[in-house]
């Protein structure tokens, strides 16, 4: 009899195991299998082991906390005669309640555990502590750990304390976290000393709050206690240093990390790459990418995306595309954000052909455009003035089942307003509201700007009143933005009307409003009106500032009324408003433009004696002014002095001197300066190459021109349509048809257009048949074009 009972028990266990084997991990069919296993075991009642039920319940909980709670309730209803939940069962239940955001039910379940006489351990409290901290109730969690757990005879462990530390740091209470850490270390933590996670959490908390000193202090305290940092600790420190662009220190920490036997991971390298990019050191970033590979750490999508983002934001899309291609060759699949980065880069540069090529590739790879990508396309067309194409993209978006969001509508409304199609913009505005989307200030700004531009003042005022009815705050900043846009477009009359409307509805103009309007009149050369605004500003109790006076002085300088500018400059100082370096720059420029070089030199001496920090822009103005007034030797002397100063020069400084030296025939000195770019840590820019190209062509050194062009591309300086057209014109004028044909091909390859002056010269020189023997050297489309003219 006993043997038969034992046999039945063994059979039950085997059967139980076979059922459990059909379970699995969460997700897909595994989760479904776990549900079936639990249901089958529960039907057995006494024949099922609690271990098997708990295992199945845990698998169900991973996929669906609600489904797990439902099955627990069935288990509880079955009663103690069938199967009795144990502490593990309750632990799963508490975890499910907390994950579902029902802390109240989680605490109720814990109360049931205590009521049933179970001895609870620290693990049972873990999900409740996490839930409280996630709800920003860390103080309640601390009360449980520091008081209630001990009252129940439960000793908190290091995991309990680490949850509190993270909760405090997430609430920007890192100082309290540090005090708790010290309590743990001083043996007041119930025998749970801090570990590497404890210290890393607090260090990271201080970094997030911007308190680097306390973060480093905690790091050194950690080392003093003999706790070795892990990769997460080092990553926190390196990421913070890179964010502060302290790249030398970040590299020191990296070297220490490796020396201590902690191997950097992809996140470590990504932080340093991001640091190099954000601090404008792309060469170092690319060099570090190579080091990353040589160290055996494979770059991920984030790594490549960081570099691409930097390059695209700096207009270096060709280099970004090379990195993109390198990424795909290595088998990494770009995400939609990666495509979006490069698409945005192409859109910003107006490279629509490349943009569409990448978009096609993206779709072929199974990634469909989202709202962000469609917005990029719409804005790209808008920038090129191709409104119809932008609207076609908007229609395609709807066809693909994507409902436009507020950002997309904002882009479309903005485009239509800028192109004068305000009525169409209003239709989309109404459609947007009908679809339940709330227009923000940007949308209203576009519409009001568009209506004002079209002289639809009544409708603009209606829209402003509508905004007030909708409870949208119409403050000074909102009006300043629209007034500024109109002023920059030369619509100062419209700006004045907006100013009057602003006052009429009770929004008070501030100093910025007056400065903006004054700038509008100055840009239009209407200095009398600008000066009236200055008087009006003072009459309402607003005090003109440095920007006010600098704007007016600049206005006078622009129309060569230098005496008036100097009178206002004296008035500025007598009013107690101190000039800044921008004010001085304006006056220096005005003096040089009116050939008052002696006065400019005197002002420079005065600036240096006043203790004002002189910027490189000031030196550039002086160098340019001296050169324009044929004082090249004086300029060269100042330039040489600048090279000896602790001042980082820029390409513009070199360009000013190269241009001046070339114009007075000092070609060798100009070439020496061109070569000196690299020794000063600089790269020649577009204007440098254009200056050198003009000189080389002028001297007939055409072989050097080709070499210069190659070095330009090697240095990552992108040639544009203007430069290629210029080179073609110069070569055509010299009768260098063969070489001109080479550069014409480049214009075609880059999808640029011939400028009118280039096309006119081309026709004049070649349509008469004078250079017939050179036809074969021209790109095919130009041959047929010339032949059609000859007929």
Curated annotation (Swiss-Prot):
Predominant subcellular localization, coarse grouping: mitochondrion
Biased composition (Gly residues): 20-30
Swiss-Prot/TrEMBL keywords: Mitochondrion, Repeat, Transit peptide
PANTHER family in the cross-refs: PENTACOTRIPEPTIDE-REPEAT REGION OF PRORP DOMAIN-CONTAINING PROTEIN, PENTATRICOPEPTIDE REPEAT-CONTAINING PROTEIN 1, MITOCHONDRIAL
Function: Reduces the expression of the cytoplasmic male sterility (CMS)-associated mitochondrial gene ORF79, encoding a cytotoxic peptide. Can restore male fertility by blocking ORF79 production via endonucleolytic cleavage of dicistronic ATP6/ORF79 mRNA. Promotes the editing of ATP6 mRNAs independently of its cleavage function.
Pfam families tied to this protein: PPR (PF01535), PPR_1 (PF12854), PPR_2 (PF13041)
GO molecular function: mRNA binding
Name the record gives this protein: Protein Rf1, mitochondrial
Lineage summary: Eukaryota, Viridiplantae, Streptophyta, Embryophyta, Tracheophyta
Subcellular locations according to the entry: Mitochondrion
Stretch forming the transit peptide: 1-27
GO CC term, one of those recorded: mitochondrion
PPR repeat start-end pairs: 86-120, 121-156, 157-194, 195-229, 230-264, 265-299, 300-334, 335-369, 370-404, 405-439, 440-474, 475-509, 510-544, 545-579, 580-614, 615-649, 650-684, 685-719, 720-754
Superkingdom field: Eukaryota
Record region (Disordered): 1-31
């Amino acid at each position: 009899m006993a043997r038969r009972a034992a046999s039945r028990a063994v059979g039950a266990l085997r059967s139980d195991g076979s059922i459990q084997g059909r379970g699995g991990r969460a997700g897909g069919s595994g989760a479904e299998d776990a549900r079936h296993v639990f249901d089958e075991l529960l039907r057995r009642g006494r024949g099922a082991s609690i271990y098997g039920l708990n295992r199945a319940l845990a698998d169900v909980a991973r996929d669906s906390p609600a489904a797990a709670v439902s099955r627990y309730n069935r288990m509880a209803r079955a009663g103690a005669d069938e199967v009795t939940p144990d502490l593990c069962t309750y632990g799963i239940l508490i975890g499910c309640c907390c994950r579902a955001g029902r802390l109240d039910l989680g605490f109720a379940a814990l109360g049931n555990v205590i009521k049933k006489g179970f001895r609870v351990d620290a693990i049972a409290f873990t999900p409740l502590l996490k839930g409280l901290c996630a709800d920003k109730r860390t103080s309640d969690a601390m009360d449980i750990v520091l008081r209630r757990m001990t009252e129940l005879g439960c000793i908190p462990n290091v995991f309990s304390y680490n949850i509190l530390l993270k909760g405090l740091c997430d609430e920007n209470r890192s100082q309290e976290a540090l005090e708790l850490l010290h309590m743990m270390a001083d043996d007041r933590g119930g025998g749970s000393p801090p570990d590497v996670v404890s210290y890393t959490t607090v260090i990271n908390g201080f970094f997030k709050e911007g308190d680097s000193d306390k973060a480093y202090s905690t790091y050194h305290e950690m080392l003093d206690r003999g706790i070795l940092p892990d990769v997460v600790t080092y990553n926190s420190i390196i990421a913070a240093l890179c964010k502060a662009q302290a790249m030398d220190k970040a590299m020191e920490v990296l070297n220490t990390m490796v020396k201590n036997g902690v191997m950097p991971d992809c996140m470590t390298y990504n932080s340093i790459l991001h640091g190099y990019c954000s601090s404008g050191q792309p060469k170092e970033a690319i060099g570090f990418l190579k080091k990353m590979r040589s160290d055996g750490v494979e770059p991920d999508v984030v790594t490549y995306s960081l570099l691409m983002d930097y390059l695209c934001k700096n207009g270096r899309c060709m280099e970004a595309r090379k990195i993109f291609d390198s990424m795909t060759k290595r088998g990494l699949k770009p995400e939609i954000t990666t495509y979006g980065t490069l698409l945005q880069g192409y859109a910003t540069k107006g490279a629509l052909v490349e943009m569409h090529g990448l978009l096609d590739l993206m779709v072929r790879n199974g990634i469909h455009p989202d709202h962000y990508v469609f917005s990029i396309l719409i804005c790209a067309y808008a920038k090129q003035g191709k409104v119809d194409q932008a609207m076609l993209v908007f229609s395609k978006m709807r066809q693909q089942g994507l409902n436009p969001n507020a950002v997309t509508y904002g882009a479309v409304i903005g485009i239509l307003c800028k192109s004068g199609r305000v009525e169409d913009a209003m239709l989309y505005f109404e459609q947007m509201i009908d679809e339940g989307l709330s227009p923000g200030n940007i949308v209203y700004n576009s519409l009001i700007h568009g209506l004002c531009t079209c002289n639809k003042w009544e409708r603009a005022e209606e829209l402003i009143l509508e905004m007030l009815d909708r409870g949208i705050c119409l403050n000074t900043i909102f009006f300043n933005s629209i007034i500024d846009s109109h002023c920059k477009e030369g619509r100062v009359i419209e700006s004045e009307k907006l100013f009057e409307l602003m006052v009429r509805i009770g929004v008070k103009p501030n100093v910025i409003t007056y400065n903006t309007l004054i700038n509008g009149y100055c840009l239009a050369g209407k200095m009398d009106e600008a000066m009236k605004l200055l008087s009006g500003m003072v009459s309402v109790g607003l005090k003109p500032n440095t920007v006010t006076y600098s704007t007016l002085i600049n206005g006078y300088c622009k129309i060569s009324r230098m005496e008036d500018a100097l009178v206002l400059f004296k008035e500025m100082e007598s009013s107690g408003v101190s000039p800044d370096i921008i004010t001085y720059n304006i006056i220096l420029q005005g003096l040089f433009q009116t050939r008052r070089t002696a006065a400019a030199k005197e002002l420079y001496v005065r600036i240096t004696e006043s203790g004002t920090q002189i910027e490189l822009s000031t030196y550039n103005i002086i160098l340019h002014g001296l050169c324009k007034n044929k004082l090249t030797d004086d300029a060269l002397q100042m330039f040489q002095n600048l090279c000896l100063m602790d001042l980082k020069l820029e390409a513009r400084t070199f360009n000013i001197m190269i241009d001046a030296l070339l114009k007075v025939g000092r070609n060798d000195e100009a070439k020496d300066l061109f070569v000196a770019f690299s020794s000063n840590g600089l790269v020649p820019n577009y204007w440098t190459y254009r200056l050198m190209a003009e000189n080389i062509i002028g001297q007939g050194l055409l072989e050097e021109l080709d070499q210069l062009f190659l070095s330009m591309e090697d240095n990552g300086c992108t040639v544009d349509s203007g430069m290629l057209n210029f080179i073609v014109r110069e070569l055509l004028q010299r009768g260098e048809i063969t070489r001109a044909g080479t550069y014409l091909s480049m214009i075609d390859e880059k999808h640029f257009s011939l400028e009118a002056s280039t096309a006119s010269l081309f026709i004049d020189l070649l349509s008469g048949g004078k250079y017939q023997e050179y036809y074969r050297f021209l790109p095919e489309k130009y041959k047929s074009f010339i032949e059609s003219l000859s007929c």
